[in-house]
């Protein structure tokens, strides 16, 4: 006869975490399970987000703004993004890591897109790429997907096209809604495994999410999308000044970092640091 534990049932061993793959995202959509995506740009931050069990990390071309200090995402290059992606991949062993293809690296056609995506995966270890546009980049998505590289699409407001769109404006209002729907269907048919919808009216995003079999990832697209994404500095309160309407701050990391830096500088100036316990 087997022995029974004296004080209650034995605790079950925790299940090992599973590496997130694209098929998990499709399964979650079918089950109605919503998930979160965050940007990440370095090893240390990626490790924190992986510990927080964020399933998908995006090394976005938003690095142009929050890492390199550009006003838009247009100037950032492939060579500038690749080292960032490497760090994120190393820091997040469980997350699906998606790497943005920067402006100018895929628009010329399918062959350019495939060459850029191939280089990105070979040199970084990323698991998927993201590119902006709907029907106009369907051929690029098809070529990259056919080569076995998962593609996340991006429709609605596309930051790389900010100059052509006349600034940061909501997309898909009025007559433009039909084109946004066409874009969503086009990227799905081209082989995208998911699609980001940015600054799209919530009602339209709900309609598109219901039409597609692939997950929709909202950023300023209302609550009905299958997932949500934010730039981590916006989410955690790292950035100063005015943020977009769709941003909610879940922390005050910037304030805490400033406090820590000020305390450190003060203790160095007064001789309080390093103390005996910090010395050999």
From Swiss-Prot:
Binds 1 Mg(2+) ion per subunit. GO terms for molecular function: 3-methyl-2-oxobutanoate hydroxymethyltransferase activity; magnesium ion binding. The lineage of its organism: Bacteria, Bacillati, Actinomycetota, Actinomycetes, Mycobacteriales. Mg(2+) binds at residues 61, 100, 132. GO terms for cellular component: cytoplasm. Belongs to the PanB family. This is 3-methyl-2-oxobutanoate hydroxymethyltransferase. Homodecamer; pentamer of dimers. One of its GO terms (biological process) is pantothenate biosynthetic process. Pathway: Cofactor biosynthesis; (R)-pantothenate biosynthesis; (R)-pantoate from 3-methyl-2-oxobutanoate: step 1/2. The gene is panB. The keyword Cytoplasm applies.
């Amino acid at each position: 006869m087997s022995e029974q534990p004296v004080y209650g049932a034995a605790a079950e061993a925790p299940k090992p975490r599973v590496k997130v793959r694209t098929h998990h995202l499709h399964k979650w959509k079918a089950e109605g399970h919503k998930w979160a995506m965050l940007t990440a740009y370095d090893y240390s931050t990626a490790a924190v987000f992986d510990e927080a069990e964020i399933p998908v990390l995006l090394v976005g071309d938003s690095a142009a703004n929050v890492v390199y200090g550009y006003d838009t995402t247009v100037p950032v290059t492939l060579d500038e993004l690749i080292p960032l992606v490497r760090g994120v991949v190393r820091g997040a062993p469980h997350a699906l890591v998606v790497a943005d293809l920067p402006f100018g690296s895929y628009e010329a056609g399918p062959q350019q897109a495939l060459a850029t995506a191939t280089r990105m995966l070979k040199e970084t270890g990323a698991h998927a790429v993201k590119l902006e546009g709907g029907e106009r980049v369907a051929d690029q998505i098809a070529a990259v997907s056919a080569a076995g590289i998962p593609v996340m699409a991006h429709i609605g407001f596309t930051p790389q096209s900010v100059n052509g769109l006349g600034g940061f404006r909501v997309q898909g209002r009025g007559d433009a809604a039909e084109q946004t729907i066409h874009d969503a269907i086009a990227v799905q048919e081209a082989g995208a495994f998911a699609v980001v919808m940015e600054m799209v009216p919530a009602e339209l995003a709900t309609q598109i999410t219901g039409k597609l079999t692939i997950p929709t990832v909202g950023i300023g697209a209302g609550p009905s999308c299958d997932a949500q994404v934010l730039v981590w500095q916006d989410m955690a309160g790292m950035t100063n000044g005015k943020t977009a309407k769709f941003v909610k701050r879940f922390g005050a990391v910037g304030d805490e970092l400033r406090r820590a830096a000020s305390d450190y500088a003060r203790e160095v100036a007064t001789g309080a640091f390093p103390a005996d316990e910090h010395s050999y």
